[in-house]
Amino acid sequence: MKLLFYFPFLFVLLHASAQHKKLFIAAGQSNAVGMGDSALSKMYASAKTFEYRFTGDSLKALTDPVGYSELHFEKANTGSEWPAFASEYSILTGNEIIIVQAARGGSSCNNKAELNNYGTWDEKGNLPLFDSAVIKIKAAEKKTRTKVGGIIWSQGERDANAINAQQLTAAAYQVSLETLINRFRKALGAGVKFYIIQTGYYIHHPREGFDAVRKVQEAISKQMKDVYIVYNETGSFEDRGWMKDEIHYNQPALNDIGRKIAMQIIQTEKKKL
């Protein structure tokens, strides 16, 4: 598993002499949308962080609630990990950061796990989301004249529940996630990096399906090039008191995710220099 570890003293500004833009995609289901508290993410407001809005083809300051109800995607209710992520990344690199939010609560990776019109990232389903994501991403690339720097993926809870319900196998989930990564790379470029926030647990529900999803995510990070687990602490959130409810992360958790994935992503980029 390509799991990275952060040591504070290792990080320096990568591009101190010039201003650069970085475009990141926030994709997945409800914990990617964000179900936290915007009052607890306000401290991450920055003049160098932005969100792309497809409606109106515009950039806006990145503040919670991040996201917009467009192209079947949703906005945070009311806090997310993205202000903390973008702020930390910008501080450590000096770059301007643009977030493209492409997440929908309850969406599945495999269409066998899809619930009604909650959406799926699979090739077929009641509400396929992939094409909408690509439309939004390409519009953002054109607007900012910047290619995607990476896709940050927070998803798996819906598929874990389907595995628990014996509607889906772990092997089928793995195929669907691998296929999704390859579809993104075909649409956006073969070198697009895929960063996984490892799925946590559903309190008071069986863990078997969630363990299966977590193991698949680890396996894919070992087997596929430029796929990384950039956060693996979600399994301890219940013990830390970092759950908003049985399935969603609270704002302290989201802030922690945001800061640490910024550090980990920078570390992957430094290794490529």
Regions found by a protein language model. Name each.
Residues Q19-L273:
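Cell-envelope and extracellular/periplasmic
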